[in-house]
């Protein structure tokens, strides 16, 4: 299963000039241009009508933020193309899985990319090394159903296993009721192939094996965490 370790998961954090983050939507003209280009340059479903956007404005949380629009990609190439278009038009992107989070991570004034419909394959199962390689939209329970005949099980057992996708769980660093014994996602994921905001496609893995730009990103995030360590410790809930 592919996903980066936590210290490597953040890429370049620079905000491009003109990008509006949070709850502010772009102009109607910009939204229309985004929809036009997505329909022309991708094979995915492009949803910019009010009812569709309304469905994606919320998740299992109490938050509600209307997205710019929605792309349901049919292949990885659609995702890469959408990121390139959004970068060109300075529109934020927001990947979405099952929308089962209770903290609002999948809501925002952005182009929502819903990976749960088509990008949900189990690409490989290595029984000898006890690993699986999957697409981000695969639901946890579906993975475990494929693993069961091999006597294997993915132990990050979130309560929403029938809806939560592996990509969303990785981004959320999910845990589950057995995390004391098995750890959370960061302890059960070996690597990830991902696109950065500039369109680069990189293979992330452990810090020990990182090189080139992947190592630079890891060092940047590590330094950022160290810089704000005292503030993080002070504000992290004591449970």
Placement of each model-derived feature along the sequence:
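N-terminal accessory segments
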Residues: 2-60, 85-93
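Hydrophobic alpha-helical scaffolding
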Residues: 24-28, 69-72, 133, 182, ...
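Generic non-transmembrane alpha-helix signal with a bias for helix starts/N-cap capping motifs
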Residues: 31-32, 79, 140, 188
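Glycine-rich N-terminal segment of FAD-binding domains in flavoprotein oxidoreductases
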Residues: 38, 50-119, 155
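Short, solvent-exposed beta-strand edge segments and adjacent coil->beta transition regions
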Residues: 65-68, 127-131
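FAD-binding subdomain of flavoenzyme oxidoreductases
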Residues: 121-125, 131-239
């Amino acid at each position: 299963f592919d996903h980066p370790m936590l210290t490597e998961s953040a890429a370049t954090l620079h905000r491009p000039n003109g990008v509006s983050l949070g709850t502010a939507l772009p102009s109607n003209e910009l939204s229309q241009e985004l929809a036009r280009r997505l329909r022309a340059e991708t094979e995915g479903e492009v949803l910019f009508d009010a009812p569709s956007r309304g469905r994606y404005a919320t998740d299992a949380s109490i938050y509600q933020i209307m997205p710019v629009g929605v792309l349901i990609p049919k292949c990885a190439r659609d995702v890469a193309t959408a990121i390139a278009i959004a970068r060109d038009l300075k529109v934020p992107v927001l990947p979405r899985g099952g929308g089962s989070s209770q903290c609002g991570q999948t809501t925002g004034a952005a182009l929502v990319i819903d990976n749960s419909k088509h990008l949900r394959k189990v690409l490989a199962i290595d029984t000898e090394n006890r690993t699986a390689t999957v697409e981000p939209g695969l639901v946890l329970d579906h993975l475990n159903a494929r693993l069961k005949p091999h006597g294997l099980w993915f132990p990050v057992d979130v309560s929403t296993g029938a809806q939560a996708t592996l990509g969303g769980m990785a981004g959320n660093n999910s845990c589950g009721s057995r995390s004391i014994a098995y750890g959370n996602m960061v302890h059960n994921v070996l690597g990830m192939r991902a696109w950065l905001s500039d369109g680069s496609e990189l293979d992330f893995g452990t810090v020990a094996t990182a090189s080139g730009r992947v190592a630079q990103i890891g060092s940047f995030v590590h330094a950022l965490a160290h810089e704000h360590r005292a503030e993080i410790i002070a504000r992290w809930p004591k449970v």
